[in-house]
């Protein structure tokens, strides 16, 4: 964690200028370094009373065990940082085939739908 601390500090400062402290935000977190840094920065902001945050991780059914490890890493990080974490499993490849979309477009549409569904279900 010490290696990303300067990046997290800088990100926190930027986020404070963009977001409202009384609002709740749902973060889409892939498990990559960038999205985990964002979640970490937002957890630090929440601890300071600057907004509240939840995380959504969507597993697209494309990368097998590697994707499941990413999902577990996101869940562990959220637990450590005190962020509620919601996960969804979707089948991007079959959705792409059924709707004549590229896999990338299908994954994006399914991810956005998952974010809308989670926000609505949990009144975020």
Label the predicted regions.
Residues 2-124:
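Core alpha/beta nucleotide-donor-binding catalytic domains of modification enzymes
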């Amino acid at each position: 964690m010490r290696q990303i601390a300067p990046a997290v500090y800088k990100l926190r400062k930027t986020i404070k200028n963009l977001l409202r402290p009384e609002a709740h935000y749902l973060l889409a977190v892939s498990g990559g370094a960038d999205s985990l840094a964002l979640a970490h920065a937002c957890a630090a902001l929440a601890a300071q009373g600057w907004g509240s945050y939840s995380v959504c991780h969507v597993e697209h059914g494309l990368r097998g065990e590697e994707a499941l490890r990413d999902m577990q890493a996101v869940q562990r990080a959220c637990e450590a940082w005190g962020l509620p974490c919601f996960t969804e499993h979707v089948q991007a490849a079959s959705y792409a085939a059924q709707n004549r979309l590229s896999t990338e477009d299908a994954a994006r549409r399914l991810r956005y739908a998952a974010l809308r569904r989670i926000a609505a279900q949990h009144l975020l």
